[in-house]
Amino acid sequence: MKSIGVFHSDPKKYLEAVLTAHSNNRPVFLGNPNWGALELKSAAQLIPVGTAIEGITLTPQGKAPSNWPEGWLDCLFIPTGGTGGKVKFVIHNTKTLRAAALGLRDALMARGLSPILHGASFTPPYHVSGLMPVLRAQFTGGSYGHYDGRFLSNQTLPEIKLPVGGTKIASLVHTQISRILEHPEGLKWLKQFNVILLGGAAVPGPVINAIRNHHLPVYASYGMTETAALCSFCPPEKIWSDEPLRGYPLPGVKFIEINHHIHIHSPACGLGYWLGEKFPDPYPTGDLGHVNADGSVEIQGRGDRIINSGGEKVDPARIEDVLKATGLVKDIFVFGVIDAQWGQRVVACVVASEYNSAALKKAVEVLEPAARPKNYIFVEKIPLDARGKFDRLAAERLLQI
């Protein structure tokens, strides 16, 4: 059966294409219609020749293993790390996706909630956080709806059309919750859900305070594309009582701490990266943290330089490559700073003339919006600390001048 790559810009059309192809045992590559030229080139080099592309014009150039497509008929290839130019597709199949859905179902059942999961999705379906609410509903006999997640101040909040029975789940990031709470009806709107899964970047204090003060049914979740979205959550009552944010693993999930790095054993873990390495068990997340005696995990940040901006993972090295290629930059260091709206925002510290700022901003238009620096710091030399490493505090002070 011929494979398909889906790039529709309309979310409902996108989901229909993915679900129809998957039900017909067609391998499905999920593409981001907003990818820039670099991301599309990277994706085309991975998607096998002969794959039918829907939604955009793209010519697949990728190679495929000898058992393609027969050995991959129930697979979904979900993108990760696309922001910044280099795309990877995580391989999931029906078994891993079902394990993720049923793991959440069982964890919520243990808390007295219905095993029928209705999902309201507010992120694009090419993100695992936008896809999984739909699959959870399918695996548990629930219903789902996809809604505009921008929550613009001049628009009314979307009407959620889900059945009364069952567990109504919203999947949101903290930026969205902040915008919803600014709306006069925001608090009432949020409380229509039994469960609000809060993912993405570290949660700012004002959002935590709002969750606590209004007793919102927020489950601070931890997970990634590789684990088919969340693999643990911190339940609302822990947040309300001002306890540390700890992720309690879903059934079948185990966290392992190795040299302060977090590894995950999970039945929902993907098979590997397409045309790349298989995932080891346990899977190394790249996150720093601590595993407590009760098995819960506390995440302390990334062990690499990845920036998480509005739920998008941004690779600073790719941005640096694009800016260096202009020939206008003698030295550069891209990093993330805390941002109340986005979690983190991208900042470029550059040894360059400020007169070239317009040209630099033009150069990064080949990247997704999330990967384009929101601020530029023009310096004579990159600030370094006594160890010869990038001095983040010095750079942040320059940013405030």
Regions found by a protein language model. Give the residues of each.
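ATP-dependent adenylate-forming carboxylate-activation enzymes
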Residues: 8-9, 28-43, 142-164, 314-319
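Gly/Ser/Thr-rich phosphate-binding loop
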Residues: 182-240
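AMP-binding/adenylate-forming catalytic domain of the ANL superfamily
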Residues: 368-390
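Conserved ATP/PPi-binding loop(s) of AMP-dependent carboxylate-activating enzymes
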Residues: 248-252, 258-283, 296, 302, ...
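AMP-binding/adenylate-forming
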Residues: 45-53, 89-110, 114-179, 195, ...
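Conserved pre-ATP/AMP-binding loop-to-beta segment of ANL
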Residues: 62-79, 111-119
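Conserved adenylation A10 loop of the ANL superfamily
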Residues: 74-89, 108
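AMP-binding/adenylate-forming catalytic core of the ANL superfamily
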Residues: 266, 281, 288-371
